[in-house]
């Protein structure tokens, strides 16, 4: 009976050793015997961009004589209908419209340091109060007309404020002075 137990134990051990050798490769030292896959790197810039050959057609914003203000500042001045659509968009998003104006400089400028600081041109004067509860975009444009009538030489921007997250979500120039 003792010989029977020992022979079955040896058989079990020999089976486990064959399974182990098939599952794990033998240790060959610290240097790997197989090489890493090598991929050819393409340094052509047109293959990296998603628009291919149109990279050559892109233009640069002219920095002389044209200031970059807010969102959409790279576009020509918005027409009345375009302003109406932008205000309708911010109302659809549930944002509160607000009007702000600046009499001197409608852009970020350097006053207190060599680099623009926290207060350098970022804060404008608010026109009245935020328009909580406004559902009609034409009401916002009427307020815009009032600002322009009161301060024709001012920069005026429309802001969409999210009162739940308490952040400004959109801001764009609605009026620039004729002299600018």
Curated annotation (Swiss-Prot):
Which GO terms are recorded in the biological process aspect for this UniProt protein? photorespiration; reductive pentose-phosphate cycle
Per UniProt, the transit peptide runs over 1-56
One Pfam family cited in the UniProt record for this chain = RbcS
- Alphabetical list of InterPro entries matching this protein: RuBisCO_ssu, RuBisCO_ssu_dom, RuBisCO_ssu_N, RuBisCO_ssu_sf
Q: Does the keyword Plastid apply?
A: yes
**Which domain of life, per UniProt?**
Eukaryota
Query: Which controlled-vocabulary keywords does the entry list?
Result: Calvin cycle, Carbon dioxide fixation, Chloroplast, Photorespiration, Photosynthesis, Plastid, Transit peptide
Gene Ontology CC: one annotated term = chloroplast
Single GO molecular function: ribulose-bisphosphate carboxylase activity
Protein's cellular compartments: Plastid, Chloroplast
**Quaternary state and partners of this protein?**
Heterohexadecamer of 8 large and 8 small subunits.
- Family of this protein: Belongs to the RuBisCO small chain family.
Remarks, miscellaneous: The basic functional RuBisCO is composed of a large chain homodimer in a 'head-to-tail' conformation. In form I RuBisCO this homodimer is arranged in a barrel-like tetramer with the small subunits forming a tetrameric 'cap' on each end of the 'barrel'.
State its role. RuBisCO catalyzes two reactions: the carboxylation of D-ribulose 1,5-bisphosphate, the primary event in carbon dioxide fixation, as well as the oxidative fragmentation of the pentose substrate. Both reactions occur simultaneously and in competition at the same active site. Although the small subunit is not catalytic it is essential for maximal activity. Binds to abscisic acid (ABA); only half of the possible binding sites are occupied in the crystal; and there are indications this is a low affinity site.
By what name is this protein known?
Ribulose bisphosphate carboxylase small subunit, chloroplastic 3
- Organism, scientific name: Pisum sativum (Garden pea)
Tell me the organism's taxonomic lineage.
Answer: Eukaryota, Viridiplantae, Streptophyta, Embryophyta, Tracheophyta
Please name the gene that encodes this protein: RBCS.3A
């Amino acid at each position: 009976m003792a010989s029977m137990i020992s022979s079955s134990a040896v058989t079990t051990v020999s089976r486990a050793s064959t399974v182990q050798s098939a599952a794990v490769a033998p240790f060959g030292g610290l240097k790997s015997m197989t090489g890493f896959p090598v991929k050819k790197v393409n340094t052509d810039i047109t293959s990296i961009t998603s628009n291919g050959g149109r990279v050559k057609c892109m233009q640069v914003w002219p920095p002389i004589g044209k200031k970059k203000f807010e969102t959409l500042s790279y576009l020509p001045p918005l027409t009345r209908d375009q302003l109406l659509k932008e205000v309708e968009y911010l109302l659809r998003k549930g944002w509160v419209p607000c009007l702000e104006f600046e009499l001197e400089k409608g852009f970020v400028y350097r006053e207190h340091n060599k680099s623009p600081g926290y207060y350098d041109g970022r804060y404008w004067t608010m026109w009245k109060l935020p328009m909580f509860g406004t559902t009609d975009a034409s009401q916002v444009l009427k307020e815009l007309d009032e600002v322009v009538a009161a301060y024709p030489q001012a920069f005026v921007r429309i802001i969409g404020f999210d009162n739940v997250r308490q952040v400004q979500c959109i801001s764009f120039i609605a009026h620039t002075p004729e002299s600018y």
